[in-house]
Design a protein with these regions (language model features):
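Acidic, proline/glycine-rich low-complexity IDRs
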Residues: 124-161
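Short, cationic low-complexity segments
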Residues: 67-87, 150-161
């Protein structure tokens, strides 16, 4: 857990990564959330290792479509499904960003995610979720999320312990 001392419109506030973790865990679409903020050396950025709920995108629906079509679905369909997942997480990211801005009365909050693992059944989605409490370019958040995602995939994640 880390704690940030920030200034908002009402004065000084402290934001604990454990409090933000509770916000993420309260979402029904996030099955698991682990605070890994202390593992990075980035000022005013919190990071979480997350797993999307298995109920959000289910292969049972895909199996039904396959049966209806009477043929195998090609890789294009899975590319479309992956883009649907990214769009879903982007919407969730926007909602979380807005919730944090409202809760802490902060304007300078940016959130970003990077999917680092999807199993072959398309039911297990793991991603890193970053929250920046400073003025930062989206390209910097993108690069940082990709680096952390690679680290999690290579064994730092609780999911692979």
């Amino acid at each position: 857990m880390i704690e940030l001392s920030l200034k908002n419109k009402k004065g000084k506030i402290n934001v604990k990564s454990s409090e933000v973790k509770n916000i993420l865990e309260s979402r029904p679409d996030f099955e698991y959330v682990q605070d890994i903020s202390a593992t990075i050396n980035q000022e005013r950025i919190m990071v979480y290792d997350c797993q999307l709920s298995r109920d959000i995108f289910n292969l049972d629906d895909i199996e039904e479509i396959k049966e209806e079509m009477g043929q195998n679905i090609d890789d294009f369909y899975f590319d479309v499904l992956f883009e649907d997942i990214r769009a879903y997480l982007k919407d969730a990211t926007d909602e979380i960003e807005e919730e944090i801005q409202e809760k802490y009365i902060l304007d300078n909050v940016r959130c970003y995610f990077d999917i680092y693992n999807i199993d072959e059944t398309f039911t297990d989605f793991k991603f890193v979720f970053l929250i920046s409490f400073k003025d930062i370019k989206i390209a910097s958040l993108t690069n940082l999320s990709k680096l952390i995602g690679k680290r999690q995939l290579s064994g730092a994640s609780k999911f692979y312990s």
